[in-house]
């Protein structure tokens, strides 16, 4: 089948490569993209026009930052795409339902759990919707394991929100705790107490800083979607709204090498002392 990928970052590229290895023709939209994504997507057919890409594609996978998910879906809808639209983004079920309304039965809800799919068993793509089984069949034997869920049209998004609420939410909390300790002048004593009562937490803090520093700008939108999900079910969403704010403070680390814990803490404290900028997703250019 002919598959379009919008817009392949680290995760989207591996989704495309998995589909390609399963025998599908994969294309992407190169318009307005920088050299880095062009290099990542060099194995795919390059289109400069979305309408042309949509006309050539049987299936489109949307794999982009959450802030851009609905906009990308609207653009595909406006290009009169008539095939299967797979939204594999980290969005709230309410956002997924809005996207589903654009495509009716041609919509498949997806949620990716795990790192970029470069080895078997590492990454799952949960799917639900009328065409979920046919999409899963496209990835049979791939490093990206497709799992079809029962439930409503946004069940995969709900699962992703619940999963990331802990993984990325707890990462934000841990970084915030380290920032608080530094600001209050108790870092050394806190670390000593951790060695006594929470062994391994210092090492986890260091690993969390390295793993999140370059991706924090992207996580901010995901935290806002998670907050919406909690609130939609009558649960407090303020924790994840706070996590979004913390990740936004780290946005300046996006283009730098992975940062150490001390570097992240200094960025947090410096950024928190300045007026908060109006950060918009630059997802379709990176």
Predicted features along the sequence, with ranges:
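Hydrophobic anchor at the start of a short beta-strand
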Residues: 3, 25-27, 107, 146, ...
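NAD(P)-dependent dehydrogenase/reductase Rossmann-like domain
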Residues: 248-286
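Glycine- and other small-residue-rich loops at beta-strand/loop junctions that grip anionic moieties
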Residues: 8, 62, 88-89, 150-151, ...
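Short, well-ordered alpha-helix to beta-strand connector turns
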Residues: 23, 43, 56-57, 82, ...
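Helical "substrate-binding/catalytic lid" subdomain
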Residues: 159-261
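Rossmann-fold NAD(P) dinucleotide-binding segment
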Residues: 50-107
């Amino acid at each position: 089948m002919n598959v379009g990928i919008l817009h392949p970052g680290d995760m989207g590229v591996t989704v495309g490569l998995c589909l390609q290895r399963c025998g599908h023709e994969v294309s992407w939209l190169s318009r307005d993209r920088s050299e880095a994504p062009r290099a990542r997507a060099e194995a795919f057919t390059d289109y400069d026009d979305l309408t042309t890409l949509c006309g050539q594609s049987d299936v489109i996978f949307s794999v982009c930052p959450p802030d851009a998910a609905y906009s990308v879906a609207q653009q595909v809808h406006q290009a009169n795409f008539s095939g299967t639209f797979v939204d594999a983004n980290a969005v709230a079920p309410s956002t997924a339902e809005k996207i589903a309304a654009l495509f009716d039965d041609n919509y498949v809800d997806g949620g990716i759990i795990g790192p970029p799919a470069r080895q078997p068993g590492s990454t799952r793509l949960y799917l639900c919707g009328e065409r979920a089984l046919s999409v899963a069949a496209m990835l049979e034997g791939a490093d990206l394991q497709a799992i079809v869920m029962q439930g409503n049209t946004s069940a995969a998004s709900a699962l992703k929100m619940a999963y990331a609420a802990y993984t990325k939410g707890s990462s934000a909390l841990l970084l915030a705790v380290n920032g608080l300790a530094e600001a209050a002048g108790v870092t050394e004593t806190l670390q000593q107490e951790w060695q006594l009562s929470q062994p391994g937490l210092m090492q986890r803090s260091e690993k969390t800083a390295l793993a999140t520093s370059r991706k924090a700008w992207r996580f901010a939108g995901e935290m806002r979607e998670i907050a919406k999900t909690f609130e939609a079910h009558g649960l407090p969403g303020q924790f994840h709204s706070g996590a979004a704010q913390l990740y936004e403070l780290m946005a300046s680390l996006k283009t730098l090498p992975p940062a150490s814990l001390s570097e992240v803490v200094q960025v947090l404290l410096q950024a928190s002392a300045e007026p908060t900028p109006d950060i918009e997703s630059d997802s379709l250019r990176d």
